[in-house]
Curated annotation (Swiss-Prot):
Coiled-coil intervals: none
Highest classification ranks of the organism: Viruses, Riboviria, Orthornavirae, Birnaviridae, Avibirnavirus
Pfam families to which the protein is assigned, alphabetical: Birna_RdRp_C, Birna_RdRp_palm, Birna_VP1_thumb
Domain RdRp catalytic per the UniProt entry, residue ranges: 397-597
Protein name per Swiss-Prot or TrEMBL: RNA-directed RNA polymerase
Alphabetic keyword roster: Covalent protein-RNA linkage, GTP-binding, Nucleotide-binding, Nucleotidyltransferase, Phosphoprotein, RNA-directed RNA polymerase, Transferase, Viral RNA replication, Virion
GN (gene name): VP1
Stretches the record annotates as Disordered: 845-878
Enzyme Commission (EC) number: 2.7.7.48
Quaternary structure, from the entry: Interacts with VP3 in the cytoplasm.
Length: 878
């Protein structure tokens, strides 16, 4: 290949393709492949400079708060429910757990978090297909314009982009932009102040996100009434035959554990994660039984407990590794708010069992606009194109913070602007209300207890919305919800649902109109039109006669790409297959060629250390690129095919078992979820592509109650006029009767709900709800309870967020070493820690919060040092 680059003939042909005149002594490789790019120096790569930037932009920096120091405890004493696990050979539950029930100290914070800041992949020759593409381009005597476009697009991506984790400057800029969305031109608004109630929002979500009962793969779930350790159920004898029923959500064990275990993974602290969650829920339960939330000492004990657990609301702010533009490398970096693992676990226990068991969307439910669990393959995209081509309009689809509208034969792709920043705690309260009343409900009876209802409605929203985060050693405010928390999807989907509800009430104006844009101000939800395609039906129909010979049109390798319509439908475009007679998906061209230029690496990080995994990853990467659309582009297809074959030969020559590597091939690819249930040897052929795109009947829906086939428009109008009826309202009343912290007549409200429950007639098919309550009465009760729940949420949030004033807090931070050059990147804020007692101290009279019956361990050297320092400072003030 080096001979090709150094030949004069090659220079002439390549230069002609790009309109570049030959230059004496200049190598073609220098023209097409840029030199190694060195990212610019990050101007905010120290805590003091970062703090100054945030202060200058009015961003709230919080007073540093202390963490309890971790101490070692016997696992069998902390988690007696899981004592059996320690007897199983191969089980990894540690004999001791490092728990935070010792004296309190300020945490030491890792300045650098993986992936490393400032590092970027620049022309990754081990994976990049550029040279192979250029080589293949040289073999074409008369290059067509489409082939030239392929080379141009790929080389432009290599020149203009880089894969990496951006900069602290980019992270800080993103934080300020999130604050502007939340508090700027259209500040966030609580839905209850706009006339919504939790029940009316739930009735909208019944249409846009119908859910079923909790479960996994047809396995029924246990009620939400237990602590996490009791969600692992042993059946049988550990010394003989046994099984373990696992009712905990799936988690990524390689991801960050978060506070209070900075620098460790969830897999390394899984025992601690369960232990902290257990203790939190048990303390909450004990206080609720004592009437916590009412005025008096019990209320103070609850707030004291929440203050002890403040770190559950403080995420670690990581940069998201992406393919960023080099021109905006300093200012554009996406953030990931990594929740503390106990917070992630407890919220996931509410959302994951329901959402993972709800494959309900536009493909299998009439009138449902949801794209949740939508797969563009197996005829999925063709169904959407048929929906677009149908003459009825306006109409809409929705997925998280993405809205798609067909209006006046124009396709609109609309995104919520900085989607997570638009979310308020009340929005998440409404989302939790929906999951509990529609998912965790058995024929109207709740499958949850008071503790879980109180946590979901009154505590969880304050843990992840408008909470706080750590970046470097700064504790700062988070505006909106933390990106990547266990409720991110449903919160964003709820926001988009409210936008569509207002659009329906306005009689569905054109998205280009000022009337449509006025929804932003009314709801306090910002959005923008990302893409619009006029004459969408005409453009889609033109794909049929223009389809070129290829894998799915004649069964041959393509010599010219077929045209596409870039719908931006969750990143997918449409093209046409003559063989199948349907529209099939290809990844949007820009995204496809950017992915070809810069790989993300092995998706499952636990496989990274496996010998031979790099070559196996190459096989998967190149074949996956072909599957998601590379098959339609001749040069990219050939380059990926040749590179995958070379990687296969390398594995075979080294004696690595190829089949073993590729058995779980979807875990190696960033596109893995797309191919769920598709089993091939990972060699792209005409037959495999046809099988992947062959239409199959959609999965049957799994819902707890029938979905209104009249669609969202009918429900929006019925709610406005008060004509809507919903038999699921009973579980909502039970929830609102139990999940409150301050309602003085809670007993009376609960009795009312039980009275309604007993009024249900014997006939299971009878419309008992119609007979017992009118909509107006229900909404009136829900409105009262919603306001009470909101009041409780404010107090909960105040306990979790230790900000002493409403003004921007501007403490002086000591200058520390630059994290790019520091030999020891671990630093702490050397300030005296403030000691805080927990609920058990209030109950027992002494000591910090630790498991009941456990003796206080001996203080560590660090704790002794901090205590002596505090004593000296106290004496000096006297």
């Amino acid at each position: 290949m080096s001979d090709v680059f150094n030949s004069p003939q090659a220079r002439t042909k390549i230069s002609a393709a790009f309109g570049i005149k030959p230059t004496a002594g200049q190598d073609v490789e220098e023209l097409l492949i840029p030199k190694v790019w060195v990212p610019p120096e990050d101007p905010l790569a120290s805590p003091s400079r970062l703090a100054k930037f945030l202060r200058e932009n009015g961003y709230k920096i919080l007073q540093p708060r202390s963490l309890p120091e971790n101490e070692e405890y016997e696992t069998d004493q902390i988690l007696p429910d899981l004592a059996w696990m320690r007897q199983i050979e191969g089980a990894v539950l540690k004999p001791t757990l490092s728990l935070h029930w010792g004296p309190r100290v300020l945490p030491k914070v890792l300045l650098n978090s993986p992936p490393e800041q400032g590092k970027a992949q620049c022309v990754p020759t081990r994976h990049c297909t550029t040279q192979a593409d250029i080589y293949l381009f040289l073999q074409v005597p008369e290059a067509t314009e489409s082939l030239k476009d392929e080379v141009t697009l790929l080389t432009q991506n290599i020149r203009d982009k880089a894969y990496g984790s951006g900069t602290y400057m980019g992270q800080a800029t993103r934080l300020v932009a999130m604050k502007e969305v939340a508090t700027g031109r259209n500040p966030n608004k609580d839905p209850l102040k706009l006339g919504y109630t939790f029940e009316s929002i739930a009735q909208l979500l019944d249409i846009t996100l119908p859910v079923g009962p909790p479960g996994e793969d047809d396995k029924p779930w246990v009620p939400l009434t237990r602590v996490p350790s009791r969600m692992l159920v042993l059946t049988g004898d550990v010394d003989g035959d046994f099984e373990v029923e696992d009712y905990l959500p799936k988690i990524n064990l390689k991801s960050s554990s978060g506070l209070p275990y900075v620098g460790r993974t969830k897999g390394e602290t899984i025992g601690e994660m369960i232990a902290i969650s257990n203790q939190f829920l048990r303390e909450l339960s004990a206080l609720l039984k004592q009437g916590a939330g009412t005025k008096g000492s019990n209320k103070k004990k609850l707030l004291s407990m929440l203050s002890d657990y403040w770190y559950l609301s403080c995420g670690l702010l990581f940069p998201k590794a992406e393919r960023y533009d080099k021109s905006t490398w300093l200012t554009k970096t996406r953030n990931i708010w990594s929740a503390p693992s106990p917070t992630h676990l407890m919220i996931s226990m509410i959302t994951w069992p329901v959402m993972s068991n709800s494959p309900n969307n536009v493909l299998n439910i009439e009138g449902c606009p949801s794209l949740y669990k939508f797969n563009p393959f197996r005829g999925g995209l063709n169904r959407i194109v048929e929906w677009i081509l149908a003459p009825e309009e306006p109409k809409a689809l929705v997925y998280a913070d993405n809205i798609y509208i067909v209006h006046s034969n124009t396709w609109y792709s609309i995104d919520l602007e900085k989607g997570e920043a638009n979310c308020t705690r009340q929005h998440m309260q409404a989302a939790m209300y929906y999951i509990l009343t529609r998912g965790w409900s058995d024929n109207g009876d709740p499958m949850f207890n008071q503790t879980w209802a109180s946590f979901a409605m009154n505590i969880a929203p304050a843990l992840v919305v408008d909470s706080s985060c750590l970046i470097m050693n700064l504790q700062i405010k988070s505006y909106g919800q933390g990106s990547g928390n266990a409720a991110t999807f449903i919160n964003n989907h709820l926001l988009s649902t409210l936008v569509l509800d207002q659009w329906n009430l306005m009689k569905q104006p054109n998205p280009d109109s000022e009337e449509f844009k006025s929804i932003e101000d009314k709801l306090g939800i910002n959005f923008k039109i990302e893409r619009s395609i006029d004459d969408i039906r005409g453009k889609l129909r033109q794909l049929v006669p223009l389809a070129q010979p290829g894998y799915l049109s004649g069964g041959v390798e393509p010599e010219q790409s077929s045209p596409t319509v870039e719908l931006d439908l969750l990143g997918w475009s449409a093209t046409y297959s003559k063989d199948l007679g349907i529209y099939v998906p290809v990844l949007d061209k820009e995204r496809l060629f950017c992915s070809a230029a810069y790989p993300k690496g092995v998706e499952n990080k636990s496989l990274k250390s496996k010998v031979g995994i790099e070559q196996a990853y190459k096989v998967v990467r190149y074949e996956a690129l072909r599957l998601v659309g590379g098959w339609n582009y001749p040069l990219l297809n050939k380059a990926c095919k040749n590179n995958a074959s070379a990687a296969r030969r390398h594995l075979e020559a080294k004696g690595f078992p190829l089949d073993e590597f590729l058995a779980e091939w979807s875990e190696l690819s960033e596109f893995g979820e797309t191919f769920e249930g598709f089993n091939i040897k990972l060699t792209v052929t005409r037959e495999n592509l046809a099988e992947l795109n062959k239409p199959v009947p959609p999965k049957p829906p799994n819902v707890n109650r029938p979905v209104n086939t009249g669609g969202l428009k009918a429900v929006s109008n019925a709610l406005k006029t008060g004509r809507y009826r919903n038999e699921a309202g009973l579980s909502g009343l039970v929830l609102l009767a139990t999940a409150r912290s301050r309602l003085q007549d809670a007993v009376k409200a609960k009795a009312e709900a039980e009275k309604l429950h007993k009024s249900k007639p014997d006939d299971p098919d009878a419309d008992w709800f119609e007979r017992s309550e009118t909509l107006s009465d229900l909404l009136e009760k829900a409105d009262v309870a919603s306001k009470v729940a909101h009041s409780a949420l404010v107090e909960t949030s105040d306990a979790l967020e230790a900000v002493q004033s409403s003004s921007v807090y501007t403490p002086k931070y000591p200058e520390v070493k630059n994290p790019q050059t520091a030999s020891n990147p671990v630093v702490g804020l050397h300030l005296p820690a403030k000691r805080a007692t927990g609920v058990q101290a209030a109950l027992l009279g002494a000591g910090t919060s630790r498991p009941m019956g456990m003796e206080a361990p001996t203080r560590s050297k660090n704790a002794v040092k901090m205590a002596k320092r505090a004593q000296r400072q106290k004496e000096s003030r006297q």
